[in-house]
Amino acid sequence: MFGFLNLHKPLHLTSHDCVAKVRRLLRQKRVGHGGTLDPLAEGVLPLAVGSATRLLPYLPGAKQYQALIRFGVRTDSDDLAGEVLESKNVSYLTLAAVEQILPTFLGEIEQIPPQYSAIQVNGKRLYELARAGIPQAVPSRMVTINDLKILGWRSGNQPELDLQVTCGEGTYIRALARDLGDRLGTGATLAGLVRQQSGGMALDNSVGLTALEKIVAEEEHIPLIPPQEALSHLPTVQLNSELEKRWFHGQRLLLPDLPVGVVLITSELGPVKCLGVALVTPEDHGTVLRPKVVLN
């Protein structure tokens, strides 16, 4: 079994829980995910099955979320799963004030990930250290937010904002909610999150765990996405039989006029077949193709 699965992760399960369930369902040892989704979030969780796990780093990095942000509340995890540090009446907050501040979060920005995150510090994940009562100084990182679209606003003692976020990989929506509240002086936390797009996969085309169980039980076709479709954003280089032999031996190939950068390698023999991923660099006499992932 070989390919990608667009899984709809349900609420309250960890990404690892989903991977474990799919391993058992498909009877496959090699299943991995393309980006952690918090237990209190649902939506697209790209999975790779079989040797396709080696291709996970090459999925598109862009992501889209629908976030529910609650103002007037601060927690130690920056979402409702954590301990409440502050809860107050901020009924004075207006949508106009939010609209004025949102553009400052667009583009490449500096962001400090939440204390409760999967980032490793000295070999330990931050959430493990936080649960053990050993908070760390979390280093900031540069992330990219491409678009912020207001979908809804509810006034009240603790107003709520529905916000669509289009961003690059590594962006924490919990941190965005926290920082938005800090910038407005009200405090804020993430009260709900749905990942609508990730790894080039969309929520509309995802399959839930219950549906997948039924598919397996009824011995229907598993909706695996072929690598050449999942990695269609990459330029494709086709190899003939002679070049294929050299490819499978891990040899670098000097070829003319290839697109520089990461490319998808396929066979020109028979049906389209993914052979792996390579890096193309310019040389004096053409371009050189260096294997990065070779799939047998």
Curated annotation (Swiss-Prot):
GO terms for biological process: mRNA pseudouridine synthesis; tRNA modification; tRNA pseudouridine synthesis. One of its GO terms (molecular function) is pseudouridine synthase activity. InterPro entries: PsdUridine_synth_cat_dom_sf (IPR020103), PsdUridine_synth_N (IPR002501), tRNA_psdUridine_synth_TruB (IPR014780). Its EC number is 5.4.99.25. Signal peptide: none annotated. It catalyses: uridine(55) in tRNA = pseudouridine(55) in tRNA. Keywords: Isomerase, tRNA processing. Coiled coil: none annotated. It is an enzyme of class 5 (isomerase). It comes from the Bacteria. Belongs to the pseudouridine synthase TruB family. Type 1 subfamily. PANTHER family: PSEUDOURIDYLATE SYNTHASE TRUB1, TRNA-PSEUDOURIDINE SYNTHASE. Responsible for synthesis of pseudouridine from uracil-55 in the psi GC loop of transfer RNAs. This is tRNA pseudouridine synthase B. The gene is truB.
